[in-house]
């Protein structure tokens, strides 16, 4: 029996693992970041918008151009990856909103194509590596699109994220002026990778900080006595009974009058309202509204005093005199007024008249 020769062979294939390297990217420098800010200066919020549940969009972000400065070595071909994270930490009334202050929540919306690789609008929420924004474009100095430190043929300048919008949501109506200090709302972070993998969360570096600042004003329309002038008539006074200094005429009955106001429904507004009364014809010793001046020397000789019957205050000053406003925004203040002799002795005959203004102020 003839045996066939056996030939054996072995193919050895060596294997090695290739790992993608990655790192952070800054704006203009590897540690740099730029700021885009929405400035809402001197914006008036009318009454129809100043209600819980109303939304409005803030001003367009101001932006500057910059260039990528990634930590990769010069000449390296890399891809760019982005991650956008909220800076505010207190969640708002629903997902995607964060608490800006006691009256406003804010939502950040990235616009499609405003960041390379972002194909649809995206609301900024808590991000993980699974929500990274990836772009398949390869950047390198060889193609005049270098992004690594030391690259001379660079990509850009750019202003990614400049079309981001902020939506403000009224959680609690407010009155008067609201100052929003410069507040970072979200941050666009960047990283590079030279393979198919994903950068780790620690690789990402701040590129763009998105912030808001400014002033909002919410005026409140108040009607006092339906807009009519409040007139208090003291009638005819016997001059012989009007001689005691800083006193009303003997036997005089003070005149009661009402100040009726309607500021709409303020029950859900965190601010408080007050009415302030100020004399416009002059004031003596803060409590006496000048109603007449003596013809011989222009010295005030007749004054008017008032008190709040419901507040237990005997005299209301005519300089920053404060009257209460009910939290509901409407009501009536019961007042009393009387004339006083400011100089003592018998006064000249004739008319007297004093005027004051009432202003509703916000606290």
From Swiss-Prot:
Compartments, as annotated in UniProt? Fimbrium
The residues forming the signal peptide are 1-20
Task: Specify the inducers.
Answer: Expression is negatively regulated by H-NS and subjected to cAMP receptor protein (CRP)-mediated catabolite repression.
Alphabetical GO CC annotations of the entry are:
pilus
Recorded phenotype for the gene knockout or disruption: Deletion of the operon under classical laboratory conditions does not result in any major effect on E.coli capacity to form biofilms compared with the wild-type strain.
Q: Which SUPFAM superfamilies match?
A: Bacterial adhesins
Its Gene Ontology biological processes? cell adhesion involved in single-species biofilm formation
Does the UniProt entry include the keyword Ribosomal protein?
no
Q: Name one Pfam family in it.
A: Fimbrial
Give the family from UniProt.
Belongs to the fimbrial protein family.
**Protein's name according to its UniProt entry:** Uncharacterized fimbrial-like protein YraK
- What are the top taxonomic ranks of the organism? Bacteria, Pseudomonadati, Pseudomonadota, Gammaproteobacteria, Enterobacterales
Which gene name does the record give? yraK
């Amino acid at each position: 029996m003839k045996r066939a020769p056996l030939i054996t062979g072995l193919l050895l294939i060596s294997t090695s693992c290739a790992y993608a390297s990655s790192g952070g990217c800054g704006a203009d420098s590897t540690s740099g970041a730029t700021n885009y800010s929405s400035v809402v200066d001197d914006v008036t919020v009318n009454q129809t918008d100043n209600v819980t549940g109303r939304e409005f969009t803030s001003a367009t972000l101001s932006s500057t151009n910059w260039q990528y400065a990634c930590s990769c070595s010069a000449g390296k071909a890399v891809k760019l990856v982005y991650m956008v994270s909220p800076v505010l930490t207190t969640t708002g009334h629903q997902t995607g909103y964060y608490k800006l202050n006691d009256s406003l929540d804010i939502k950040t919306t990235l616009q499609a194509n405003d960041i390379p690789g972002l194909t649809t609008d995206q609301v900024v929420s808590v991000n993980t590596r699974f929500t990274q924004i990836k772009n398949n474009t390869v950047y390198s100095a060889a193609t005049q699109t270098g992004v690594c430190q030391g690259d001379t043929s660079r990509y850009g300048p750019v202003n990614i994220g400049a079309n981001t919008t902020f939506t403000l949501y009224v959680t609690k109506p407010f009155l008067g002026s609201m100052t929003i200090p410069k507040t970072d709302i979200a941050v666009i972070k960047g990283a590079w990778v030279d393979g198919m993998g994903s950068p780790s969360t620690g690789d990402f570096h701040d590129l763009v900080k998105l912030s808001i600042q400014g002033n909002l004003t919410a005026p409140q329309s108040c009607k006092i006595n339906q807009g009519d002038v409040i007139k208090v008539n003291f009638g005819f006074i016997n001059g012989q009974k009007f001689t005691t200094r800083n006193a009303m005429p003997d036997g005089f009955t003070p005149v009661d009058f009402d100040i009726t106001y309607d500021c709409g429904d303020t029950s859900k507004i965190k601010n408080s309202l007050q009415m302030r009364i100020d004399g416009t014809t002059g004031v003596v010793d803060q409590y006496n509204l000048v109603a007449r001046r003596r013809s011989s020397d222009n010295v005030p000789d007749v004054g008017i005093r008032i008190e709040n019957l419901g507040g237990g205050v005997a005299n209301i000053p005519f300089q920053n005199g404060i009257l209460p406003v009910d939290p509901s925004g409407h009501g009536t203040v019961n007042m009393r007024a009387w004339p006083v002799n400011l100089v003592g002795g018998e006064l000249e005959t004739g008319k007297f008249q004093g005027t004051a203004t009432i202003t509703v102020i916000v606290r």
